[in-house]
């Protein structure tokens, strides 16, 4: 809700939609969230989503499982070291289904298997240009 009041550009790493359409359903499907808890969660999500506006632009970085594994290894976070490949695959499938049905606003899909932002400044510049073009129609 604070984002609505902001006068400057806000960039978020995650949206409320991802938890509701990807992570929570995945936990429910894995048997790690009860049906009652999932239904309660989704009811709360619907209330929250009615109070916030969708982003001006949703940037989706589409990545293959090998790219995801590579990024996880680069980060070196201990708690991520035991993430299973089948879990990543299920999340990827849920992301793809969600993105395919996303109709709340503008969407920019970038192939993360191609881009290497931290190492390649030209890639970062290209991505920034694409974002600016979507937001402002400048390019």
Feature roles, as predicted:
Residues 1-34:
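A basic- and aromatic-enriched beta-loop-alpha substructure that forms the phosphate/nucleotide-
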Residues 11, 58-60, 107-109:
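Conserved beta-strand scaffold positions in the cores of enzyme catalytic domains, especially
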Residues 2, 8, 49-50, 99-100:
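Short secondary-structure boundary/capping segments
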Residues 16-18, 63-68, 114-117:
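Conserved nucleotide-binding/hydrolysis micro-motifs of P-loop NTPases
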Residues 21-96:
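A glycine- and Lys/Arg-enriched "phosphate-lid" helix/loop adjacent to the NTP-binding pocket
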Residues 69-139:
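NTP-dependent small-molecule kinase module
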Residues 7-8, 55, 104-106:
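A generic structural signal for alpha->beta connector loops
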